[in-house]
Amino acid sequence: MTNEIRNELQLMTNALRDKIQIEKVILFGSQAYGNPKEDSDIDLCIITEENKRKIELIREIRRIIKPYKTHSMDILVYNLKEFSEKSNNFAGIEKTINEKGVLIYG
């Protein structure tokens, strides 16, 4: 992860912490695993304790980070219980995020 990406993620995380109740922010994908290409996007997993519908939460997160976002970004959002269950019980993306992702906050 470059310093530019690290700074962008820090600004976004700080903005999110001021507005919503986040437990963790995890970077995953090529930026986290050390093999990004020039046009690679940023893959983020945001784990929260908010009791809002997921679609509403994603919209709110996108609105909050928009002023700081300079790269293309994919965002996955989970509540803490959901992420814990999926990362422990399945061989899916949640397990990979939990094992290989880079913890940005939490």
What label would you give each PLM region?
Residues M1-K24, Y33-E38, E49-G106:
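Catalytic core of pol beta-like nucleotidyltransferases
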Residues F28-S30:
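Glycine-rich beta-strand-to-loop/alpha-helix junction loops that act as flexible
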Residues S40-I42:
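Short, conserved active-site loops that position catalytic residues or coordinate cofactors/metal ions
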Residues C45-I47:
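Short hydrophobic/aromatic beta-strand micro-patches
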